[in-house]
Amino acid sequence: MQQLCKGNVAVVKGALLAGCRAFYGYPITPASEIAEAAALFLPQVGATFLQAESEVAAINMVYGAAAAGVRVMTASSGPGLSLMQEGISYIAGAELPCVIVDVMRGGPGLGNIAPEQSDYFAMVKGGGHGNYRNIVLAPASVQEMSELTTLAFDLADKYRNPVIVLADGFVGQMMEKLDLTYREATPPEKLWAVKGTPETRKNLISSIFLEPDELEEHQRQMEAKYARARNEETRYEEYRTDDADVLLVGYGIVSRVLRSVVEEARRKGLRVGLFRPITLWPFPSNALSQAATRAGKVLVVELSNGQMVEDVRLAVNGKVSVEFYGRTGGNVPSVEEICAELTARAALTV
């Protein structure tokens, strides 16, 4: 079924297709429509929506529902996610599945409500305390806002871990075609949940391990599942990279601008390609390294002062030059702006 839909609303429709049965959150621009849509749609299928008194309360409600075996989610933006970080660390430490949507806005501090990509470090590098990882998915369209949210629930259950849908505010606020295909949600049986089973006692779920050896073993087990995710879950998209001399790298709304840059640059005689990471963690390092090595030059474009570029440089490992171009404050570089940047940089290397 095709419909015109806002990105934030598409998140909730994707969650419903995944069998989400609880949403706890607190409204914040530019993510508020997710809570509004959840309040409208979840009760219609017998699911729970609750607006908490704060983001701290919301993430701890998510912890409780996840421990009970419910497919549960929350959504927020910048400052709200900062308040949730302790709870996210607890959820990861207790190995509980949940989905968290971050519709990024400008920062630091209160910043503004305009879109940015400045939460990359906070979400991709963990954000909270301790040795844990978030699986992070980066949609670039309204369609992917729905599809990657559905996928997020499956990955959360597969790895018993928080999964972040990291969207810039442009993708959250834009409206475009959404093609929804009904699927029967089949969440796995959760024998580990606090309710246990008729044949077993109830389970105790916690993230505290008082004995050093117990905590170390717990962290080894967590690292083993993260290693499995690195091997099985990297996702990315390449566009016209086979003969490219310059490789553009961007995610979210930036990747859509860069696709147009590729076409415009090629009309001007520059062989340019695009690499779009879809999983920001696990980062598609091997595929990016191969594409970058073929090209010889890399330009990373972000709506930040340079965050993902650090992972790009780690992936390339000094094999080729990696340069950066960024805009902040809610400004998105135009196709003409990036093409001019490419032309200027190409002239400097002649």
Question: Where are the regions a protein language model picked out?
Answer:
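Glycine-/acidic-rich phosphate or pyrophosphate-binding loops and their flanking alpha/beta elements
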Residues: 6-10, 223-246, 259
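Peripheral docking tails and interdomain loops at the edges
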Residues: 302-350
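Conserved thiamine diphosphate
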Residues: 114-168
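Glycine-rich beta-alpha junction loops
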Residues: 105-107, 167-174, 252-254, 305, ...
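Conformationally flexible catalytic loops at phosphate/diphosphate-handling active centers
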Residues: 160-238
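Generic long, charged, amphipathic alpha-helical segments
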Residues: 258-291
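Thiamine diphosphate
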Residues: 1-126, 133, 141, 328, ...
